[in-house]
Regions:
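A cross-kingdom feature that marks ATP-driven nucleic-acid transaction machinery
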Residues: 1-61
Length: 61
């Protein structure tokens, strides 16, 4: 599995932003499942999922 993302520390808050396919962010159940699967790689931090629409505009969840 290849994960494309970053761990960011902003104003003392550490979180992860992970790029996923748009199909992952279309359904709440898939977002929850994906966050759960990624939690082992990013313990004890919030995980933000980022996908892009057809025009390349990023959306964060």
């Amino acid at each position: 599995m290849t994960i494309h993302g970053a761990v960011i520390i902003e104003q003392g808050v550490t979180f992860a932003i992970i790029a996923v396919k748009q199909s992952v962010t279309m359904y709440t159940a898939r977002m929850v499942q994906t966050r759960h699967e990624l939690a082992q790689f990013f313990p004890n931090m919030p995980i933000i999922l980022m996908s892009q629409d057809n025009s390349g505009t990023p959306h964060y969840y």
